[in-house]
Amino acid sequence: MAAGGRMEDGSLDITQSIEDDPLLDAQLLPHHSLQAHFRPRFHPLPTVIIVNLLWFIHLVFVVLAFLTGVLCSYPNPNEDKCPGNYTNPLKVQTVIILGKVILWILHLLLECYIQYHHSKIRNRGYNLIYRSTRHLKRLALMIQSSGNTVLLLILCMQHSFPEPGRLYLDLILAILALELICSLICLLIYTVKIRRFNKAKPEPDILEEEKIYAYPSNITSETGFRTISSLEEIVEKQGDTIEYLKRHNALLSKRLLALTSSDLGCQPSRT
């Protein structure tokens, strides 16, 4: 009898604690509210406009360099004959080299800008687009740096052997044209990739993989030998996924706590 009384008291305590729990007494949040707060929102990459602006500036610079070099300095590179002495007291080649340095600085700033936004989108779980453009976004700056190295060698040769001045001008203009072609190809490929990504508006990679694994017939077998590069990519992908899940869980916990607090605050206090 005593044991039965204790069991009844225990059940009464549990029932009373459940009834007094405000979280259990709170109403469930509607489904659309949960989706609005917990579904990751897509943020497009805003780098396409800046990339297009830079390659347009690059194109204008090369065209002006060709016009200035051919019209002002091509007949005799040792004598600048620009109308109105626009480049005075600097020579035409000096103005072209200074413009090239400014263009390299713009490419450096672009690379930093792209890296900043790509790091942000990597933190949101889009590791595939980050890895697919990791080397592409740096290639334009590498091309500009390589061109600067070649121009420096040309200027050194011109300083030691100043006689074939017209040849040096031809080499400088040829390097500028080659840089323009290579940079435009890289930036065009990058622009196409980012535009497709922004247009598709995909969910984070881990959610996209869940959709794929929901249909086993679409999964190809990967048994057999794996190369070292493949293993490195798998390890890097797993690390990125773990980091994303940690940040996502922390964000969901904060949002859930905020929603619960706001829902409890809207309810009238129990008497």
Curated annotation (Swiss-Prot):
Residues 1-46, 115-138, 193-271 are cytoplasmic. GO terms for cellular component: endosome; late endosome; lysosomal membrane; lysosome; nucleoplasm; perinuclear region of cytoplasm. It is found in: Lysosome membrane; Late endosome. Not N-glycosylated. It comes from the Eukaryota. Pfam families: TMEM192. Coiled coil: none annotated. The chain crosses the membrane at residues 47-67, 94-114, 139-159, 172-192. Disulfide bonds: none annotated. The modification Phosphoserine is found at S17, S229, S230, S269. Its main location: membrane. One of its GO terms (molecular function) is protein homodimerization activity. The modification Phosphotyrosine is found at Y213. Homodimer. This is Transmembrane protein 192.
